[in-house]
């Protein structure tokens, strides 16, 4: 029973990351091989504060408060997505793919080089995030939190795809030149989608860090991005059909 529960929990967590990637891949046509970076940053947002809470050092980071972990993950993954997006989105096609992968590998080698957090061997998290009324040490509650989060982000992405922003994003994917001629700021819309996609993956990383109680640079490696890509492609890039698509 515990095996299937753990499997279901892991699937829910990775599905959240896939939903985030799908926002830019399925609806924006942006093929990113760097989204594992945001997943890993979210996991490290749990592991690093917990490590300092247990063993000291960097007192301003030392905490097991789950809400603080989530805020750190959102801030770090959002900022990294902003910085990488500003550069990556100036390119297209294979160049975009390679640059997103390059940024992911930069983050990978950064954490490999930090011996305090385990380097290449990773870091065991001896305590999970603490959230009022929720015990993440309980496998059933861990699954329920992961499943509820998946439903929430699916609903949120659904709202985005049905909004004017989502329709513009779909239009950019279908015919970017036409959207430019209509006066839309294509770069801005793609950047906002890219940032939001990274934040969703960062939140998934918080859950993944709590689930595995272990973080390592392997979470950031480009091969993990490839796994997320396959999940999106096999599951169907367009989770929701936009109204514009219905009209066609």
Where are these regions (language model features)?
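Transmembrane alpha-helices and adjacent helix-loop boundaries
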Residues: 1-243, 248
